[in-house]
């Protein structure tokens, strides 16, 4: 007979942990990328709820492990995405920004550069052909596992900052999704997928059908990405400043005293172009009318 003892636990935000059971022999350690906060990272192409990284045998009293860019590449990617998503949730709690929905499903795809927030697990009904063309070799399992967020990690291996900024960008989209719902998201995501498949650029030129959804969504996501990057690394990298939409508008509104939560609260279901956004901002923050007019005029809006 073979006796197998299994113990599971969660680490705290600093990576510390303690098992409730003791071992007499060296156990085999594994990290499962699922947590109490509300998201999981998967999958290993098998029927499990989240990705698992095998660490190997270690001391019966516990194992200390430092994961960096020289570690296993898959393990590093998973850890960075996990840390970034956890950090985003904490930022939402601190600032009052709407949380992403619970039970988010992440896929980390090393065959792709672009990332996306499809929100399929949360009911966004997207064209299967478009999604399949985007996901590539993972198309056969899309319908079963329905990802919410895909992180394209190609050319980002070993680059903590790049993976971090990409992840918080997509998490910002998930917060926006929680404000607007599935019908809004279908139009928005369809624009993104169609633009990427037809031109190789996710955002198009701003003239296509439903481009207004893209403008609002990407302004918010790039604004949050830049803000959180600056808080972590001490500088604003200006991600997205070259595109036809202008996330700088939101950055300058925040600098002038309009909070992140106030901005997102103006991005409800009916806010699907820049003119409506300005109108809602003026209605909700009439005390900042001069600032709003000045900033929108500065960027030709």
What are these regions (language model features)?
Residues 201-257:
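Metalloprotease/metallohydrolase-associated module, dominated by Zn2+-dependent proteases
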Residues 2-16:
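Short, acidic Ser/Thr/Gly-rich low-complexity loop/linker segments typical of extracellular
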Residues 234-301:
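Pan-zinc metallopeptidase signature
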Residues 118-181, 191:
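Active-site scaffold of zinc-dependent metalloenzymes
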Residues 18-29:
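Short Pro-Gly-centered beta-turn/loop motif in secreted/extracellular proteins
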Residues 178-208:
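Post-HEXXH active-site segment of zinc metalloproteases
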């Amino acid at each position: 007979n073979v006796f197998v003892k299994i113990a599971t636990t969660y680490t705290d935000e600093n990576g510390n942990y303690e098992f409730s059971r003791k071992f007499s022999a060296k156990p085999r350690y594994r990290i499962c990328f699922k947590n109490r906060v509300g998201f999981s990272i998967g999958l290993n192409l098998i029927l499990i709820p989240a990705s698992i990284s095998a660490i190997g045998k270690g001391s019966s009293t516990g194992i200390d492990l430092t994961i960096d860019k020289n570690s296993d590449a898959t393990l590093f990617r998973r850890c960075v995405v996990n840390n970034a998503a956890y950090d985003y949730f904490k930022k939402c709690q601190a600032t009052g920004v709407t949380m992403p929905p619970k039970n988010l499903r992440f896929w980390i795809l090393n065959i792709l550069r672009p990332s996306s927030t499809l929100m399929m697990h949360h009911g966004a009904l997207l064209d299967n052909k478009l999604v399949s063309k985007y996901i590539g070799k993972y198309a056969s399992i899309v319908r079963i596992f329905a990802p919410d967020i895909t992180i394209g990690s190609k050319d980002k291996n070993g680059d903590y900052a790049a993976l971090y900024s990409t992840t918080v960008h997509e998490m910002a989209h998930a917060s926006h999704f929680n404000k607007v719902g599935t019908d809004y998201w279908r139009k928005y995501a369809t624009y993104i997928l169609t633009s990427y498949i037809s031109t190789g650029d996710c955002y198009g030129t701003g003239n296509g059908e439903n481009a207004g959804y893209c403008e609002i969504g990407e302004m918010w996501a790039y604004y949050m990405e830049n803000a959180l990057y600056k808080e972590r690394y001490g500088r604003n990298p200006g991600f997205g400043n070259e595109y036809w939409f202008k996330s700088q508008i939101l950055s300058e509104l925040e600098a002038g005293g309009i909070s992140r939560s106030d901005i997102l609260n103006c991005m409800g279901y009916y806010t699907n172009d820049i003119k409506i956004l300005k109108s809602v901002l003026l209605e909700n923050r009439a005390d900042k009318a001069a600032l709003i007019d000045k900033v929108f005029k500065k960027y030709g809006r």
